[in-house]
Regions:
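Positively charged n-region of N-terminal signal peptides that target proteins for export
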Residues: 1-4
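Bacterial N-terminal signal peptides
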Residues: 6-15
Length: 104
């Protein structure tokens, strides 16, 4: 009986974090799409926090690149510069040289 309970606890311990990450990734995608719409409408003050939250939930390089572009458009050049540097570093590490080049 103890082994069964221990096995169930162990199984739940591996399943629950994966479920939480999937939910975070889905929420991040929704936020990213909304931010993209706002960015396209030049509503940078509304778009940038959504890009930031999307990146926090699912830290993908593309989300960080979008956030950097948003901060640049918003006039927050120091923030954008740091983010572009991070994008370039991460993109090169991921083998995405075209993205790294666009970030520089």
């Amino acid at each position: 009986m103890r082994r069964l309970v221990a096995g169930l606890v162990l199984a739940l311990g591996t399943i629950l974090p994966a479920t939480a990450h999937a939910q975070d990734a889905a929420a991040a995608e929704v936020l990213f799409q909304k931010a993209r719409q706002l960015f396209d409408q030049k509503k940078y003050a509304e778009a940038c926090p959504k890009f930031a939250e999307s990146y926090r939930l699912d830290p993908l390089t593309g989300a960080l690149l979008a956030l950097a572009s948003c901060h640049e458009a918003e006039g927050k050049l120091a923030s954008a510069w740091v983010e572009y540097l991070d994008v370039a570093t991460r993109a090169r590490r991921e083998g995405k040289n075209d993205r790294a080049d666009s970030a520089q």
